[in-house]
Amino acid sequence: MDIRQVTETIAMIEEQNFDIRTITMGISLLDCIDPDINRAAEKIYQKITTKAANLVAVGDEIAAELGIPIVNKRVSVTPISLIGAATDATDYVVLAKALDKAAKEIGVDFIGGFSALVQKGYQKGDEILINSIPRALAETDKVCSSVNIGSTKSGINMTAVADMGRIIKETANLSDMGVAKLVVFANAVEDNPFMAGAFHGVGEADVIINVGVSGPGVVKRALEKVRGQSFDVVAETVKKTAFKITRIGQLVGQMASERLGVEFGIVDLSLAPTPAVGDSVARVLEEMGLETVGTHGTTAALALLNDQVKKGGVMACNQVGGLSGAFIPVSEDEGMIAAVQNGSLNLEKLEAMTAICSVGLDMIAIPEDTPAETIAAMIADEAAIGVINMKTTAVRIIPKGREGDMIEFGGLLGTAPVMKVNGASSVDFISRGGQIPAPIHSFKN
């Protein structure tokens, strides 16, 4: 590495808000299954506090050694619906509290995996877990929850979609922060290091380390140097920048896995913004020549960004996965917030952008009087985009306040303007229930 590369890396950290967003340890809880829910809770607590005992210390040590901020240390676990199903319990709040207690003991920021996978129907534990979500998130501080309601192979479970519309409303009524820690997925991935949707898939190793990076400020600074040049130059610039960002992510992941004595999983090739000025995905898109995010051309700019981030990242790291793309959460990106406030970005345009970005309608505040069926219909629309396009899509919606209000979450979750929602009813559509079949192109065997 020559001196120019060293100074580039220093500038990325000091001036362009580059950081490692998260080191996430995935832990299998399949060996914690017990017919007695209290014994299962104790086994869960013991395994997490044993396996992840040094996670925070190692993360801090690597950050100090490399001079690169590591913002979050997190844990993801096997979907709790699988663990709870072995018990006779009628709710799984006690398991959520065990996760929360373990997370506090080891000092991590969040723990994900209070989850269920119901893309093709409910098993015993799934329905119990879903109905436990509002209380579980209200009575814990660090637990994150996710439910997968569709996949390209299975179609969309519309009964679960309807249930999740209701659950989101109930969660919002029970606590201020609960809905910010609840994601509804289609095509959820098993190795996601990002919250709130992380869970540890049953096909993963017993314990692994996954890394998520963050570098929209770095990409924007690189694009500032090629203003007015062709899209060929823009694409190459983004690709080379993504390579550098991902290379550092791989280094951190390998160091963490070696020191913790566990397998290295993946680097998630995602550009994750924060509310800080200079750390915005929206501003990267505007640097390509858009007056403001939300105007015509936004989706095309996002397509270029997303694809080149993947191309550069794949070259830099031989183990990539997770969600891998540009995140467009409204509350966590100062450029997105500004675009909503000036009227150039609405829900419909955000939905179009989710056909390309790494997740979906993320951290979006809507009026608190929005019916559960309308929320369910938003989930169905997002799931349809994911299922048809063979990509992960998700909804993390915040029904709080009235249109035009600003909802404060603080920290990385930021501030969300309450957006206008189409007032026409979707009740008859959602009340049908059943399954939307898998698309024809999913049949590949």
Swiss-Prot record:
Name of the molecule in the record: UPF0210 protein SPP_0289
Recorded family membership: Belongs to the UPF0210 family.
Pfam families assigned to the protein according to its UniProt record, in alphabetical order: DUF711
InterPro entries per record: UPF0210
Coiled-coil positions: none
Quaternary data: Homodimer.
PANTHER family membership: UPF0210 PROTEIN MJ1665, UPF0210 PROTEIN SPR0218
Organism in which the protein naturally occurs: Streptococcus pneumoniae (strain P1031)
Domain of life: Bacteria
